[in-house]
Amino acid sequence: MSRLPDRSLLTRCEIFVYFGVYIAYIVVGLYKIYGLRDHIVKEAKFQFPEGWSLYPFSQRRRDDSNDELENFGDFIVSFWPFYLLHVAVQGFIRWKRPRLQCLGFIGVCALALSVNLDWSSMVLLVTLIASYYIVSLLSLKFLVWLLSAGWILCINVMQKNVWWTDRVGYTEYVLVIVTMSWSVLRGCSYSLSKIGAKQEDLTRYSLVQYLGYAMYFPCLTYGPIISYQRFAARREDEVQNWLGFVGGVLRSAIWWLVMQCALHYFYIHYMSRDVRMVEMMDSVFWQHSAGYFMGQFFFLYYVVTYGLGIAFAVQDGIPAPNRPRCIGRIHFYSDMWKYFDEGLYEFLFQNIYAELCGKRSSAAAKFGATALTFAFVFVWHGCYTYVLIWSILNFLCLAAEKVFKTFTAMPEYQRWTQRHLGAVGAQRLYAMLATQLFIPAAFSNVYFIGGQEIGDFLMRGAYLSGVGNYVALCFCSYCFFQCSELLLTKSDGRSKTKTF
C-alpha cells in the first residue's frame, strides 16, 4: 500500500498540520537564509559582482557562484541569434518543404559552431559525431559501448589539458566538454536504436536523419537528451503552435529572471561551496533547509535550460520529454530519476538496464543491472569523488526502496496493517517507514549539487546531532512525504478524470 486510498479519510485538521509544517519550515528556512545575506557578502572568500543597475537590485551584490548558470548566460549572449535563425528556418521549411527539416537542423548548427568555435574544437565535435555513424554501420553493440568508453576517457583527459584550455578559453572549454558529453549519449541512442531496428525501418536511420539528430541546435549543449526514437517519430507536417512555443520560451525566461532576482538576496549557491556559511545558521535543524533550497535552485536551473530546449523541440514536432518535476513533489527517489530528467532516465533504462535484465529476472540480476547503470552515470558525469559518493548513495537508496516496496506489497504485511491499523493508519505507518528512505535520499543530492564537503556536513548534521534533532527532522520529513502523497493522489485523480 503506497497511496492514500481516499484523501477524504484524513481529517482536515491532519491535512492542515501536514501542509502547515511543510510551508512553515520552508518559509522560516528561507527567511533565515535571507537573514545571512550581509554576513555572507562580508565573509565570502571572493567578492560578488555588482547587482543589476535597476533599483532595488542596484543596492545588492549578485551571487555568481554557480558556474553552470553563469556559463548558460554566456552561451545565450553568444548564441541567441542562432536560436532566432533556427526558428525562422524551421518556420519556412515546415511551411514550404517539411521533408528538408533535418537539413535545416544541420545548417543552423553548423553555422553556429563554425562562427563561434576554434578549429580544434570543431575537429573534436565532428570526429565524435562521425565516429558514431561509422560504428553504427558495423551493427555490433559492444563496439558502440567501446567507442563511448573511449570518448568518455577522452573528455576526462581534456578536462585536465591546460594547453587546449588556454588556447580556446574557459567559456569555449566548458561549451565543448558539455556538448561532447551530450553527444556521446545521442550517438549511443542512434547507434543502438539502429542496430536493434527491423530491416524495413532502416530508412529512418539515414545519414541526413542522424546528422539532423546529432546537430539539433536547441538541445545541443544544454539538453535535454532526446532519444533517437523520439526524434524519428517527429511530426514534420504538423501545424506549428506558435502561441504554445512563445509561452514555453517565456516560461524559461521568467524563471531565469526570478532566479537572477533571488540571487541578489539569497546566496544559496555560495553556501553550497562554503560550508562556513551554512554553519552560521541558528541550529542544525535549520541547516537542513539550506540543503532543501540548494535542491530547489538546482531544479530551477533545469527548468530554465531544459524548458528552453523542450519548447523548441515541441515546436519542431519532436515528442520531447516532460519538463523536470519539482523536487518538493518527489518523495521516492525512483521518482526523482523518472521525472526530474525523463530523457536521461529513458536513455539509461532502455540502453543499459533493460539490456541487462527483464521483468522476470532475479533480484540479483536487477541489482547488478542497477549497479552497472550507476557505474555509467558515474563515469559520464566525471570521475570525481563527490560524484562517486552520490552514485553509490543513489544505488543504495534505490535498492533499499525496492526492498521496502516489495516488503510492504506482501499480502501478509497488508493484511496485518489493515486488521490492526485500518486503511489510513496503515498509510501513516507506510509514510513513517518510507521517511527513513526519504531522508538519506534527499541529502545524497547535496553531494552532487554542492560537493563532498557540504554533503558530508549536512549528512553528519542529520545523523550525528542528537536524538532530538533527528526526531524533529523525521517529523518534518514525514509531513513532507504526506503532502507529496496528497498532491500525487490529487494529480492522479485529475488524470483519470481527463481520461474518462
From Swiss-Prot:
InterPro entries documented for this protein: MB_O-acyltransferase (IPR051085), MBOAT_fam (IPR004299)
This protein's record includes keyword Cell membrane: no
UniProt keyword annotations, A-Z: Acyltransferase, Developmental protein, Membrane, Segmentation polarity protein, Transferase, Transmembrane, Transmembrane helix
Q: What is this protein called?
A: Protein-cysteine N-palmitoyltransferase Rasp
| Family listed | Belongs to the membrane-bound acyltransferase family. HHAT subfamily.
Indicate where this protein resides in the cell.
Membrane
Entry membrane topology: Multi-pass membrane protein
Spell out the GO cellular component terms annotated for this protein, sorted alphabetically and separated by semicolons.
Answer: cytosol; endoplasmic reticulum; membrane
- Purpose of the protein: Required in hedgehog (hh) expressing cells for production of appropriate signaling activity in embryos and in the imaginal precursors of adult tissues. Acts within the secretory pathway to catalyze N-terminal palmitoylation of Hh; this lipid modification is required for the embryonic and larval patterning activities of the Hh signal. Not required for Wg signaling.
What GO molecular functions are on record for this protein?
A: acyltransferase activity; palmitoyltransferase activity; protein-cysteine S-palmitoyltransferase activity
| Reactions this protein catalyses | N-terminal L-cysteinyl-[protein] + hexadecanoyl-CoA = N-terminal N-hexadecanoyl-L-cysteinyl-[protein] + CoA + H(+); N-terminal L-cysteinyl-[protein]-C-terminal glycyl cholesterol ester + hexadecanoyl-CoA = N-terminal N-hexadecanoyl-L-cysteinyl-[protein]-C-terminal glycyl cholesterol ester + CoA + H(+)
Kindly identify the residues recorded as the active site: 381
- Does the UniProt entry include the keyword DNA repair? no
Q: What class of enzyme is it?
A: transferase
